[in-house]
Amino acid sequence: MAAAALRGGWCRCPRRCLGSGIQFLSSHNLPRGGSSYQISRPGGELTLTKSYSSGSRKGFLSGLLDNIKQELAQNKEMKESIKKFRDEAKKLEESDALQEARRKYKTIESETVRTSEAIKKKLGELTGTVKESLDEVSKSDLGRKIKEGVEEAARTAKQSAESVSKGGEKLGKTAAFKAISQGVESVKKEIDESVLGHTGTYRRPERLRKRTEFAGAKFKESKVFEANEEALGVVLHKDSKWYQQWKDFKDNNVVFNRFFEMKMKYDESDNVLIRASRALTDKVTDLLGGLFSKTEMSEVLTEILRVDPTFDKDRFLHQCETDIIPNILEAMISGELDILKDWCYEATYNQLAHSIQQAKALGLQFHSRILDISNVDLAMGKMMEQGPVLIVTFQAQLVMVIKNPKGEVFDGDPDKVLRMLYVWALCRDQEELNPYAAWRLLDISASSTEQIL
């Protein structure tokens, strides 16, 4: 009966169950729709209960089969689409319109090839004909004469060119031509320097030097003149008296201040006509300024010549542009106090050194640089009680940058160019008899504008 029951579908392990003495609670077949069955050992030692259902939930194999069927169906649709596309392409390939277009293209291509070959052949025939004609002409008397005439003309032209070249060399060696050439070069150089404002690209001195160091090499070659106190009528004095007298003059003289205010506007103009007019007015002033009246500038220059007969205004301005200004200005923007102290009078040095000393006390570093120095000019002169003072104006392009100990920008802008207009008062040091080291900075003033380009 147990075997029959097993064959009925409700137990699949008859040997194991019967051998272990498991008692079947029911001999009825388990329903297919879902129920529960129990298996118990005699004595109630083991009871196993299992519930199952065969609802709408699909098994793993059933889902896998469904996916395979869907993929096959999609592959079948794709194959049908590819087949239809190939059929359409084949119909297009075999269409009359496409066949006709191909025939026309082949016809045009063959015609083009034949035309090119015909043109090439005609050009070859024409070239041969022209060559034969030229050979015949060259063999005739007329052709020989034409050829000889061309050769003669070429020889004549060559001889003429050689004659002109030799004549130019002879002209270039004449004294008159040399004088004219030198004059033209001088005028050109003068115009360039006056209009453009400088003679070359600015270069920082290899080493900032003091006045005595700068004059050392020239001192051996130059004659030093002693001061004639009887002719001058003055006695050597200290820096403080010089500076105090200059300050009184500068602060109380309205004409002086108005003059420099107008000159700043005039010199700062970038208009080409104004720059050209500056050059013209400067030259006319130099030539005619001292002919009709005894100006204060002439008195100052005369007084300087009494002490230094070799003094020349143009040479002095060149010295300012290439030596005096670069050394002092580089020392100012880089914080070189020793250089400043040697070039400046005491009051001016104290004024400049104060801000530098404060910056160094904070550990700040100077990274400024000078790009250009131009338009160096002798604006005016002033006779002080102790000696002559020359006021020099010039323009400088600077990049002002100060960094903290971490290397960060503390003040200034490394990408901003400043155009500075300086007014310097230079005094001849009465205690220094060497003319190349006699000038010191008595006072300084400046105005700045941002350079756009």
From Swiss-Prot:
<protein>
    <recommendedName>
        <fullName>Mitochondrial import inner membrane translocase subunit TIM44</fullName>
    </recommendedName>
</protein>
<dbReference type="GO" id="GO:0005759">
    <property type="term" value="C:mitochondrial matrix"/>
</dbReference>
<keyword id="KW-0999">Mitochondrion inner membrane</keyword>
<dbReference type="InterPro" id="IPR017303">
    <property type="entry name" value="Tim44"/>
</dbReference>
<dbReference type="GO" id="GO:0051087">
    <property type="term" value="F:protein-folding chaperone binding"/>
</dbReference>
<dbReference type="InterPro" id="IPR039544">
    <property type="entry name" value="Tim44-like"/>
</dbReference>
<dbReference type="GO" id="GO:0005524">
    <property type="term" value="F:ATP binding"/>
</dbReference>
<dbReference type="GO" id="GO:0005743">
    <property type="term" value="C:mitochondrial inner membrane"/>
</dbReference>
<dbReference type="GO" id="GO:0006886">
    <property type="term" value="P:intracellular protein transport"/>
</dbReference>
<feature type="modified residue" description="Phosphoserine">
    <location>
        <position position="181"/>
    </location>
</feature>
<keyword id="KW-0597">Phosphoprotein</keyword>
<keyword id="KW-0496">Mitochondrion</keyword>
<comment type="function">
    <text>Essential component of the PAM complex, a complex required for the translocation of transit peptide-containing proteins from the inner membrane into the mitochondrial matrix in an ATP-dependent manner. Recruits mitochondrial HSP70 to drive protein translocation into the matrix using ATP as an energy source.</text>
</comment>
<keyword id="KW-0472">Membrane</keyword>
<dbReference type="InterPro" id="IPR032710">
    <property type="entry name" value="NTF2-like_dom_sf"/>
</dbReference>
<dbReference type="GO" id="GO:0055007">
    <property type="term" value="P:cardiac muscle cell differentiation"/>
</dbReference>
<feature type="modified residue" description="N6-succinyllysine">
    <location>
        <position position="218"/>
    </location>
</feature>
<keyword id="KW-0813">Transport</keyword>
<dbReference type="GO" id="GO:0005744">
    <property type="term" value="C:TIM23 mitochondrial import inner membrane translocase complex"/>
</dbReference>
<keyword id="KW-0067">ATP-binding</keyword>
<keyword id="KW-0547">Nucleotide-binding</keyword>
<comment type="subunit">
    <text>Probable component of the PAM complex at least composed of a mitochondrial HSP70 protein, GRPEL1 or GRPEL2, TIMM44, TIMM16/PAM16 and TIMM14/DNAJC19. The complex interacts with the TIMM23 component of the TIM23 complex. Interacts with SLC25A4/ANT1 and SLC25A5/ANT2; leading to inhibit the presequence translocase TIMM23, thereby promoting stabilization of PINK1.</text>
</comment>
<keyword id="KW-0811">Translocation</keyword>
<keyword id="KW-0809">Transit peptide</keyword>
<feature type="modified residue" description="N6-succinyllysine">
    <location>
        <position position="178"/>
    </location>
</feature>
<dbReference type="InterPro" id="IPR007379">
    <property type="entry name" value="Tim44-like_dom"/>
</dbReference>
<dbReference type="Pfam" id="PF04280">
    <property type="entry name" value="Tim44"/>
</dbReference>
<comment type="similarity">
    <text>Belongs to the Tim44 family.</text>
</comment>
<dbReference type="GO" id="GO:1905242">
    <property type="term" value="P:response to 3,3',5-triiodo-L-thyronine"/>
</dbReference>
<dbReference type="GO" id="GO:0030150">
    <property type="term" value="P:protein import into mitochondrial matrix"/>
</dbReference>
<keyword id="KW-0653">Protein transport</keyword>
<feature type="binding site">
    <location>
        <begin position="167"/>
        <end position="174"/>
    </location>
    <ligand>
        <name>ATP</name>
    </ligand>
</feature>
<feature type="modified residue" description="Phosphothreonine">
    <location>
        <position position="129"/>
    </location>
</feature>
